[in-house]
Amino acid sequence: DNVTIEHSAIVHGCTIGDNTLIGMGAIVLNGARIGKNCIIGAGALVTQGTDIPDGSLAFGSPAKVIRALTADEIEENHRNAMHYVEIARESLI
């Protein structure tokens, strides 16, 4: 729930936890597991079988965990997802 996958991202055969954002142009490959409350940076490459723990910021190629997200960043992920839900609702009217 509340996952945001930004423009040109590729997600294939992976698991993405709730309230996570996959940045523009990121690639997440088979068997990768992205925990809940994460941000995968724009252009990141999450390789096959990689495990990104809950609450992590990860970027790079290959993607590596840089640090834990702050409470404000986790809340912003949720607000971002809800914004897209609202846009979708408006477009259906």
What residues fall within each predicted segment?
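C-terminal segments of enzyme domains that contribute to small-molecule binding surfaces
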Residues: 4-5, 9-10, 57-93
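A structural motif detector for beta-strand N-caps
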Residues: 1-9, 14, 19-26, 32, ...
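Residue-level preference for alpha-helix termini and adjacent loops
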Residues: 28, 51, 64-68
